[in-house]
Curated annotation (Swiss-Prot):
SUPFAM superfamilies: Defensin-like. GO terms for biological process: cell chemotaxis; defense response to bacterium. GO terms for molecular function: CCR6 chemokine receptor binding; chemoattractant activity. The gene is DEFB13. Keywords: Antibiotic, Antimicrobial, Defensin, Disulfide bond, Secreted. It is found in: Secreted. It comes from Bos taurus (Bovine). Belongs to the beta-defensin family. Neutrophilic granules. Its main location: secreted. PANTHER family: BETA-DEFENSIN (PTHR20515), DEFENSIN BETA 4A (PTHR20515:SF2). Has bactericidal activity. Active against E.coli ML35 and S.aureus 502A. This is Beta-defensin 13.
Length: 42
């Protein structure tokens, strides 16, 4: 929760992926507003 930018996404072990996260990953926040998701594989 509270992940809303690329810096906090990366700090939490995530990567920024447009539109939606691929299947093994789960969304933990957003990066550049809602269209870009912050995704993590664990």
């Amino acid at each position: 929760s509270g992940i809303s930018g690329p810096l906090s996404c990366g700090r939490n072990g995530g990567v920024c992926i447009p539109i939606r996260c691929p299947v093994p990953m789960r969304q933990i926040g957003t990066c550049f507003g809602r269209p870009v998701k912050c995704c993590r594989s664990w």
